Amino acid sequence: MAIISSVNRTCASESLLELYRSYKYILSTSFNIIIPIISLFFLVYAIKQLCAQSIIQYSTRVLLITTILFAVCHQIAYFCFKADLLYTMLFKLDQPCNLQHSSYDCRFITIATTTSNCGMALVQLAMSIDRVFALKFNRVYYKLKSIPGITLALITLSISFSMFFILTIDDPLSGYVNHCGFYPTYSQDKFHIFLDVTLYLAVFNFVFDIGLMYYSYQEILWKRSYSFVNRFQSRISLKCTQAIFIISICQCISNVLYSGLLSLLMKLGRYMSSADYNLSLSLAYTTPYSCLILPILICKVLEYIKKQRTVGILSLRNQKQSMEGHMAMINSAWK
């Protein structure tokens, strides 16, 4: 059985010490430290790109930046606990009975990772809601500019930051864990429920985004106008929806992997040794890699939209359509 936490401080098992002495695990932990450093560069670059892009609607831009800020928060916390783990493996193995950390000492890292994982999951839902506003209330949405995004971002931030305190409301944080990557001793059942809810939310977002993408395409075709400005705004709305769809789908898959694998690992932990559990955890925790892929994906999507905008402007300027052709297009959109 994997001893990952305890009520009182316990000495490290021989198998865990052997794992900590393993060059493979040391190299793996060192690699895990490099990942957040590299990702922070791309995350900052993605924020600069979003601030410079006028093609992305204001509200959508706010939510994308919010997602990136959650990712930055996570990567900083992840770097801190991995660096502490590496320090333990290199310099503290001669104190096997002092390797564990109290849940209280790990509280800041746990708050940061819980807030970030919850926030990135909720922002996907917020971006889908934002797209619904953009499609159903197009004129009002354009007038409000960034207000819908700011409102949704504040709600998401409030829920995400409160999540740790809700999950540990009756936890004195007096237990001990092998390192700060583990959940508090007395709250593991609640965190397990949190992972299940995250999984269900990711699946819901996945299905909702597919339906929203189909609806948005039909809605744009129906609302096409002879006015160049209206047609251009429709194209912009559709391209933004496509961008959010691509990013949301990738994030949903990431959330499914993160919550599903961790939930499975927590169930199987009682049948595993501490060494096997630690190795499995380093593989199952996919969020750091998602935070690395996220800014790269955003930059690629922005580049694609920029190219499509140029093509769209040229096609709209050259487009000539009769009344019969316009009605045929509307009829085909609803078949």
Curated annotation (Swiss-Prot):
It is a multi-pass membrane protein. SUPFAM superfamilies: Family A G protein-coupled receptor-like. It is found in: Membrane. Chemosensory receptor that negatively regulates RAS/MAPK signaling during vulva induction and the negative regulation of olfaction of volitile attractants. Required for the suppression of vulval induction in response to food starvation. Signaling acts through the GPA-5 G-alpha protein subunit. The lineage of its organism: Eukaryota, Metazoa, Ecdysozoa, Nematoda, Chromadorea. The chain crosses the membrane at residues 26-46, 62-82, 109-129, 147-167, 193-213, 244-264, 279-299. Residues 47-61, 130-146, 214-243, 300-335 are cytoplasmic. Expressed in the AWA and AWC chemosensory neurons. Keywords: Membrane, Olfaction, Receptor, Sensory transduction, Transmembrane, Transmembrane helix. One of its GO terms (molecular function) is olfactory receptor activity. It holds the Pfam family 7TM_GPCR_Sra. This is Serpentine receptor class alpha-13. Residues 1-25, 83-108, 168-192, 265-278 are extracellular. The keyword Cytoplasm does not apply. GO terms for biological process: detection of chemical stimulus involved in sensory perception; detection of chemical stimulus involved in sensory perception of smell; negative regulation of Ras protein signal transduction; negative regulation of response to food; negative regulation of vulval development. Signal peptide: none annotated. Belongs to the nematode receptor-like protein sra family. InterPro entries: 7TM_GPCR_serpentine_rcpt_Sra (IPR000344), Nematode_rcpt-like_serp_alpha (IPR051080). GO terms for cellular component: membrane. It comes from Caenorhabditis elegans.
